[in-house]
Design a protein with these regions (language model features):
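C-terminal regulatory/interaction regions
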Residues: 1-16, 287-329
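N-terminal amphipathic/basic leader segments beginning at the initiator methionine
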Residues: 4-34
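Conserved beta-strand hairpin/beta-sheet module of binuclear metal-dependent hydrolase folds
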Residues: 24-86, 206-222
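Short Pro/Gly-enriched beta-strand edge/turn motifs at strand-loop
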Residues: 30-38, 160-167, 187-189
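Metallo-beta-lactamase
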Residues: 59-69, 164-175, 183-185, 190-286
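Active-site HxH/HxHxD metal-binding segment of metal-dependent hydrolases
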Residues: 67-71, 76-185, 212, 269, ...
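Aromatic/hydrophobic pocket-lining residues that form the small-molecule binding cavity
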Residues: 75, 243, 247, 325
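Histidine-centered divalent metal-coordination motifs
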Residues: 94-100, 199, 203, 264, ...
Length: 329
């Protein structure tokens, strides 16, 4: 591990100890028995990190990538090569989004492995994947019409509806629930579950005090602020408050010197600085938004978007931006 450390890579109070990213089929060991693999995504965010944990005579996999032929081929390459044909004992998914859960069912079936996931995300994932092929509900149309969507935007929403499950292999019919403070033993070491909310309903991070490693999923990412959106399924929810509360809680229970292994970008040190930046970023946005909303505004108004986002909002990110805008309002 130490040969790959580059202590001088530092920015915004964060330190990135690895000067290279994993190549196809060649994971990098970031801590004893903890390996970082990287897979391609067909989205604007073009990659996901998945984590391989050595577990006696086999492996534990944390997060899985989307269900596509290229992703399956990447896993097959790892099985035959780096993983040495050894069994996978457990598949653990941090949360319900397709880039994390997409191949969980396939991996579990392939190895007859145990499947671990939080209850809320498991059930929500099955519900949303079950919408495939269904007609858009009137509640959704009413929700986005109230947000300011015009007929063209509503048509695009209708066309998108039911697409959540297109890159998700059917989930296992049974799972092992993970919840706050649960402990999972892997290779003789205890990994504690730390739950966050806001980006996903019940996002599970894995923290190992002995290794001083936090597998953070999308809950803490060094150079991306995870999307926090309000959806028509819970129109009176407050996911942004959930997110900020989760950041405060994690800062209080996880030490600052932990190695953070995120789902995107690179492993880093500086957990508390990053959590502070995430909290401050949203609170500053709320302050500016309060000023802008002295006059009536819609969630999708340009002035609202300009307060919340540094980039121009195009069609490819419009729905995510609208959801985040609604969460802030």
């Amino acid at each position: 591990v130490t040969e790959k450390i580059k202590a001088t890579s530092q920015a915004h109070g964060l330190r990135y100890p690895f000067d290279e990213k994993p190549q196809l089929g060649e994971p990098i060991e970031v801590a004893d028995g903890v390996f970082w693999a990287r897979m391609d995504l067909p989205y604007t965010l073009d990659h996901i990190n998945v984590w391989l944990l050595r577990d006696g005579d086999g492996w534990v996999i944390v997060d899985t990538c989307v269900d596509m032929d290229t992703s399956r081929a990447h896993w097959e390459n790892l099985f035959a090569g780096f993983m040495g044909g050894k069994p996978v004992h457990k598949v653990i998914v941090t949360h319900m989004h397709p880039d994390h859960v997409g191949l969980a069912g396939w991996l579990v079936n392939h190895f007859d492995a145990d499947f671990h996931m939080s209850r809320t995300d498991y059930l929500m994932c099955r519900t949303m994947a079950g919408d495939t092929g269904k007609q858009v509900p009137e509640e959704g149309l009413r929700f986005y019409r109230a947000a300011g969507f015009n007929d063209e935007a509503l048509e695009r929403y209708s066309a998108r509806f039911g697409g959540f499950g297109q890159h998700i292999h059917p989930l296992p019919q049974a799972y092992k629930r993970v919840k706050q403070d649960d402990e999972i033993e892997i290779d003789g070491h205890i990994w504690r579950i730390e739950i966050g909310s806001g980006h996903a309903p019940e996002h599970a991070c894995l923290y190992c005090p002995e290794k001083n490693v936090l597998i953070s999923g999308d809950q803490v990412i060094p150079r991306i602020s995870s999307n926090v959106s309000l959806f028509p399924t819970e129109p009176m929810g407050n996911p942004l408050q959930d997110w900020i509360d989760s950041c405060h809680r994690l800062r209080g229970v996880i030490p600052d010197d932990v190695l953070v292994c995120p789902a995107h970008n690179e492993p880093f040190y500086g957990l508390h600085a990053r959590l502070n930046a995430l909290i401050d970023g949203h609170e500053n946005s709320l302050t500016r938004l309060h000023e802008v909303c002295a006059a009536p505004r819609r969630a999708i108004d340009g002035k609202v978007f300009s307060v919340l986002f540094k980039r121009k909002i195009g069609r490819e990110v419009f729905f995510m931006a609208a959801g985040e805008s609604l969460a802030h309002l």
